[in-house]
């Protein structure tokens, strides 16, 4: 029997089955329980600035953030929350809002019931909800508010604000062990226990499992992977993934993608945030785009049409293909908010923009619509392929504009009400 016919040799590429978790509703968004992995983000505005926060939540929502977290750190911020919610609704935006509470969340929720009602989820950090004898009461107060208003809660441990009493206890216990672990391993265990013990306490107070999401964030990739693997192995709570303090630019993107990519491949994670430090004056929505691209490139979800483009080499000294690839990608992202309703299914479109004859025609044939631009020294002609077949050859100085027009035409005919493709309608025009 040929090796390819051996059942044990069959293609097993793909992620592990999703870790089974209890589904939680955050507003209208389902998290866990087999629901699609949810993208979320966080504002960096002063929440007391109602108009500024509305504008940023709206921008994050348009970019694709399905939930947005806002800081609630003082009375002015708490008082602003219902106005932010109302302002978003006037704009037709129903994106769930998550209140991020530290230190005095119990007091803010009690003093501002309109805030408690307006939020869709409360985030509690068990490391700073209170200290010593105050901890249990203040934690209980927040959980009881969530029960009263029917809200979900994320219990989010973070090793930058880890419960020091728990950590000290585990360190002392480890020191007296016959085979003590490294301090780093004990810290990871403290992270997991902090989340799980807090969740157990919340259940004892009366908050059901289907209202709780857990997270345990660290800033080191290998530690994050280990912490979440342990957390998933010990519970079936819905899980929020994120690498804290990931950093700026490419470093933050690479670190977050490396950590979350491994966990997602193992079936762990129900909602994710890519925590990027924005460049001065940078676009906050970048973290949403990266989260979407991570999920889409791994095959978990589709958000926008993908544009494949070659990296370039000595055969492509012209920048035309690079400029066209960027132009098409930017155009698609800008148009997606309207296309989602106008062209259902358009997010599954694949476009190829290639730079020379070596791989250009082949890659273009694999895409729904693709173009192979001429490389250095090649004839000034660019064949266009539609659904795997040569459709037309573009020439002249307006190749980029002509190809964009063909992409628009393809989308309209394939995903519009007619459901046709350019090859159906205009095959006679092809060479």
Curated annotation (Swiss-Prot):
UniProt xrefs under PANTHER family? 4-HYDROXY-3-METHYLBUT-2-EN-1-YL DIPHOSPHATE SYNTHASE, 4-HYDROXY-3-METHYLBUT-2-EN-1-YL DIPHOSPHATE SYNTHASE (FERREDOXIN), CHLOROPLASTIC
Q: Which Gene3D superfamilies match?
A: Dihydropteroate synthase-like, Sulfite Reductase Hemoprotein, domain 1
Q: Which GO molecular function terms does the record list?
A: 4 iron, 4 sulfur cluster binding; 4-hydroxy-3-methylbut-2-en-1-yl diphosphate synthase activity (ferredoxin); 4-hydroxy-3-methylbut-2-enyl-diphosphate synthase activity (flavodoxin); iron ion binding
Listed binding positions for [4Fe-4S] cluster are 310, 313, 356, 363
Per its record, the protein catalyses: (2E)-4-hydroxy-3-methylbut-2-enyl diphosphate + oxidized [flavodoxin] + H2O + 2 H(+) = 2-C-methyl-D-erythritol 2,4-cyclic diphosphate + reduced [flavodoxin]
Q: Give the residue ranges for region: Disordered.
A: 1-21
Q: What is the protein's name according to its record?
A: 4-hydroxy-3-methylbut-2-en-1-yl diphosphate synthase (flavodoxin)
The EC number on file is 1.17.7.3
InterPro entries (alphabetical): Dihydropteroate_synth-like_sf, IspG_bac, IspG_bac-typ, NO2/SO3_Rdtase_4Fe4S_sf
Q: Which UniProt key words apply to this protein? A: 4Fe-4S, Iron, Iron-sulfur, Isoprene biosynthesis, Metal-binding, Oxidoreductase
For the biological process aspect of GO, one term held by this record is: terpenoid biosynthetic process
Give the protein family. Belongs to the IspG family.
Q: Which HAMAP family match?
A: IspG
Pfam families in alphabetical order: GcpE
Q: How is the cofactor bound?
A: Binds 1 [4Fe-4S] cluster.
Which pathway, per its entry? Isoprenoid biosynthesis; isopentenyl diphosphate biosynthesis via DXP pathway; isopentenyl diphosphate from 1-deoxy-D-xylulose 5-phosphate: step 5/6
Top enzyme category: oxidoreductase
The gene it comes from is: ispG
Cofactors needed by this protein, per the record, are: [4Fe-4S] cluster
Report the protein's function: Converts 2C-methyl-D-erythritol 2,4-cyclodiphosphate (ME-2,4cPP) into 1-hydroxy-2-methyl-2-(E)-butenyl 4-diphosphate.
């Amino acid at each position: 029997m040929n090796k390819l016919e051996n059942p044990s040799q069959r293609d097993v590429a793909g992620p592990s089955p999703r870790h089974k978790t209890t589904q939680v509703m955050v507003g209208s968004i389902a998290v866990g329980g087999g629901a699609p992995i949810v993208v979320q983000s966080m504002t960096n505005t002063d929440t007391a600035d109602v108009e500024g926060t509305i504008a940023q939540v709206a921008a994050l929502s348009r970019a694709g953030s399905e939930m947005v977290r806002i800081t609630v750190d003082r009375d002015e911020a708490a008082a602003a929350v219902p106005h932010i919610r109302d302002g978003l609704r006037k704009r037709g935006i129903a994106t769930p809002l998550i209140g991020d509470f530290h230190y005095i969340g119990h007091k803010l929720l009690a003093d501002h019931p309109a805030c408690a009602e307006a939020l869709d989820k409360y985030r509690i950090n068990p490391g700073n909800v209170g200290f010593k004898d105050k901890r249990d009461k203040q934690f209980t107060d927040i959980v009881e508010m969530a029960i009263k208003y029917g809200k979900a809660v994320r219990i989010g441990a973070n090793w930058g604000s880890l419960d020091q009493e728990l950590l000290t206890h585990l360190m002392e216990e480890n020191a007296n062990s016959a085979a003590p672990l490294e301090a780093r391993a004990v810290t990871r265990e403290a992270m997991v226990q902090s989340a799980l013990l807090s969740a157990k306490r919340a259940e004892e107070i009366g908050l059901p499992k289907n209202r709780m999401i857990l997270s345990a964030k660290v800033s080191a990739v290998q530690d994050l992977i280990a912490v979440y693997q342990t957390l998933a192995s010990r519970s079936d709570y819905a899980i929020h993934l994120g690498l804290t303090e990931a950093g700026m630019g490419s470093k933050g993107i690479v670190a977050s993608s490396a950590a979350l990519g491994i966990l997602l491949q193992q079936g762990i994670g129900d909602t994710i945030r890519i925590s990027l430090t924005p460049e001065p004056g940078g676009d906050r929505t970048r973290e949403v785009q990266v989260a979407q691209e991570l999920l889409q490139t791994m095959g978990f979800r589709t958000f926008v049409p993908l544009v494949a483009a070659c990296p370039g080499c000595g055969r492509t000294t012209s920048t035309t293909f690079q400029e066209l690839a960027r132009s098409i990608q930017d155009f698609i992202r800008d148009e997606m908010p309207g296309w989602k309703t106008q062209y259902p299914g358009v997010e599954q479109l694949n476009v190829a923009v290639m730079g020379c004859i070596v791989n250009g025609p082949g890659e273009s044939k694999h895409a729904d619509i693709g173009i192979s631009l001429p490389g250095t020294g090649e004839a000034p002609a660019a064949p266009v392929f539609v659904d795997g077949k040569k459709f037309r050859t573009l020439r002249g100085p307006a190749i980029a504009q002509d190809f964009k027009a063909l992409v628009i035409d393809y989308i309209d005919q394939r995903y519009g009400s007619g459901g046709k493709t350019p090859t159906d309608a205009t095959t006679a025009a092809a060479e």
